[in-house]
Amino acid sequence: MLVHGFTTESYLREITIPAIERGAAAGGRERSAIELSLPAFVVTGPDEATMAANAAGVRSQIAFYGSTPNYRGVLEHHGWGDLQPELNALSKEGKWVEMGNLIDDDMLHTFAVVAEPTEVAAGILGRFGDVVQRVSFYAPYATPAGFWAPIVAELQEG
């Protein structure tokens, strides 16, 4: 089962997983029979300037999802529900940069693993390693060939 990327660790654990468990039980299945796959937001890069640019891309993606009324529940879970209509209004005006600017550092770090490349795997495993069986990188920015290979290797070992 693919879990939506617009999630946080606490939303996944407190809202999504219990809903999956209820659905599994209603169908006579155990939660353990359902493999979860998560596209996790990741902000990383080889230096501070690259990380800042990559963070801007992830902030924009979070803002885009946050503008969608059906995803307001994730924001409300963290006390950010009032941001949703503002993001929605800005999206209708095509103000994409302004939308991303509304995603502060606390929100960014709640939605995304923000880490140097050598710490990304540990960040993902620490948040999601005990609840998802597969993970992909939701990283809306370019990286050089082979960039993700050591991170993938560490995740496979973890």
Question: What residues fall within each predicted segment?
Answer:
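Active-site-adjacent structural elements that line small-molecule/cofactor binding pockets in enzymes
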Residues: M1-G158
